[in-house]
Amino acid sequence: MISERLPFLPEVLPSFRPCPPAHDRAGWETLPPAAKKRLMAAGAAEAAKPLPALPLSLWLDFARTGKRSEWEEACFARRARLCALAAAECVEYQGRFLDAIADTV
């Protein structure tokens, strides 16, 4: 049971970061070249595409009817775009993707 294992947990869990902050260049420079290339290609592809629409009416429809598929599709497209742009900016760290990131947020 979970309750039996709770005493073994520390009072404060250690912080976790799935990747280093963008300014930690040493962390990003250790990525294999193939991974950098893949992340840069994904970011460039997203930056070249128009921003996916996310009208409030989709969320309102979800709130009213409970039908979330259309809102989720639009929201997840934005989230995937943001992840690709942010990762590419972290790899390159030149500011090229910052405007697209700001527009997506």
Regions found by a protein language model. Name each.
Residues 1-105:
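Extracellular glycan-targeting catalytic surfaces
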